[in-house]
Amino acid sequence: MPTGEILLNLKKLNVLGSVLYVAAHPDDENTIMLSWLAKERKVRTSYLSVTRGDGGQNLVGSELSDLLGLIRTQELLAARAIDGPEQYFTRANDFGFSKNTDETMQIWGKEAVLGDVVWRIRNLRPDVIVCRFPPDPRAGHGNHSASGVLAEEAFKISGDPTKYPEQLKYVKPWQAKRVVWNTFNFGTVAQTQKPAEKDWIQVDIGVYNPLLGKSYNEIAAESRSQHKSQGFGVPRGRGARPEYFVHKFGDKAEKDVFDGVDITWNRVKGGKEIETIINEAIKNFNADSPSTIVSNLVKAYKMVLNLEDEYWKNQKKKELENLIIACTGLYFEANPNEYSAASGEKINVTTILIKRSDLPITLNKIRLIGLSRDTTMKTELGNNELQRITFPVEIAKGQALTQPYWLAEKKMGKGMYRVDNQELIGLPEKAADLQAEFSFTIENQVFNFNTPIIFKYTDEIRGELYRSFEIRPEISVNISDKVYVFADNQAKDTEITLKSAKANVSGSVSLALPNGWKAEPASIDFNLANKYQEQKVIFKVTPSSKDSEGQIQVIAKTANGTFNRGILTVAYDHIPPQTLFPISEAKVVKLDIKFKGKNIGYIAGAGDEVPAALRQIGYAVTMLTEKEFNEDLSKFDAIVVGVRAYNTEERLKFYQKKLMEYVEKGGNMIVQYQVNNNLQKIDGGMGPFPFKVSRERVTVEDA
């Protein structure tokens, strides 16, 4: 932690306030406001994104839906690491654009998602709740307005113990002081829609922070540019930035958003003495020798442990621990020799530890949580002396798989992810099951610091990198397609890829099929001698004689049990690799298809999987490159333009004339979803007759 940040966080110790910012999606948040709240006002700041952005588009790859939500979760965490707040979610799924609140609430399930918002309020105990959107059509999107409705209703009931009483096993009711709307710039709001002047307060959030060497505009630009899958890179702004808080419910603020809220140590019994010690630490702080204030920090830490207020005790305990680590120059980590392992496998975990200060510190012990290793040491740490200790360990039988917790089970319908563990609901990620605990004595006080066991590796271009240590099933089974369509009674090849997570895995694999369907052979044996080895096998699947549909599931059996999960890793340079293990299954459909034409020319768009679906039905699909455009297009019965192709494919403006000639001669051309942002400038427009692409959307998916 740089010394400027240390001093900033020292000052933050004296602030006992909390704010919750609520919106619908990743990238809805006002990153300048969040940065200002966290680093200028120094209150505990949290962003609750009702969804993970699963329904958006993907400008960096082909992942959509759940996998896009996984990417955008990591992008939000990267953003929060820059601008400072904590990140949370509900179980709601972003199902795409919605024109009104009622539709959104019906699909999400209002009572469930409202309960998730109440749960987060009771956990975070915000003094102020800030809505990004109003609860009405001005929000411009049903998800947006729904987030405003949820925030306001949750504010009204989160302090009522009769509402969602099952939560009270873990949290207490909490009543925030007020709800405000962080409104849009009034210059863009119609006069009739503007709130009365007395109902809002104005703040300048574009100020400069000399401890960080940046303004909040600049910090927020770096933060917002983490939304790379949405193409949200923005320039750094500088200068004054007026923002507005419009009063909605609760006690009205007259001058400051925290009016009437004591955000000093006076709000907790025994806090005044702690404030005095922290002020001494701030006064004595020396950027050339941060360890000189550790004695003050430890003294404050001991007093915090005796606070009656559990919420602020836990919060300030965590803040003090982070500062003590920074000021002592402590660094510690625990790295396995493999990035993944399977149940029962033996690996090595190496702990690395160093202290970069002259302050006396004793290492008491190292404990590997979840791996049954506990080593007592009582070692005095020297200044800048690196210590490595390697522990041979065995992964426990039945150790839980490492994957995004909200994707471990199938969704509860279209609008809600299934999460049965109440304490996990809303967390961006589950804490690592396998951790290393380092126990130190500092200034006669024992500290136990935990860190996840995490794999470290070096990329020759990007340098040192980290990825989560994964527990995998000993055998994973991936099916090649998500859907198999049979237009006749002919058998189709179904390819299965088996992958081992450890050495010497053998057994058999088979398909579970709907009634009337058949696979040949009935099962196939496999024997994988090496870790990460793959083997491909093919079943010939024959459909039912009648039109029908159903699911096929892949099942592998070994001496250690039955396995039915595939493996999928999402990897991009801007996020850590994310691995999940979905149930290995596919939809099978037998139906009578009437073809009119068979040859399709296809222009790929962003994240495009439509060509594979067309081939699955039985069409011959040719991807149109420069070579095909220089040939006769009349051989195609239709030409299909992929999603956002006119936004992402610059070459289209050069080929548009030839495409229109194809249409003029009677050819069929289908253009899928395009947006007016970054649309290619094409002479004559996108079609045979003039038209403009608006921002209006067709959203009834089942029409």
Model region roles, listed by residue range:
Residues N337-F595:
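Long beta-sheet-rich domains in secretory-pathway and surface-associated proteins
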Residues M1-P165, N185:
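Active-site beta-strand->loop->alpha-helix modules in alpha/beta enzyme cores, enriched
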Residues V641-A703:
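A glycine-rich, often tryptophan-bearing local segment used as a flexible ligand/cofactor-contacting loop or short
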Residues N30-T31, G56-N58, F97-K99, R138-H141, ...:
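Extracytoplasmic/secreted cell-surface and envelope-processing proteins
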Residues E5, I157-Y331:
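The feature marks non-catalytic terminal segments
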Residues K42-V43, S158, W174-K177, K665-N668:
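A short helix->loop->beta-strand "cap" motif at the edges of active sites that frequently abuts
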Residues L20, V130, D637-G642, I670:
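Structural motif
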Residues T562-G642:
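Aromatic-Pro/Gly-enriched surface loop or interdomain linker
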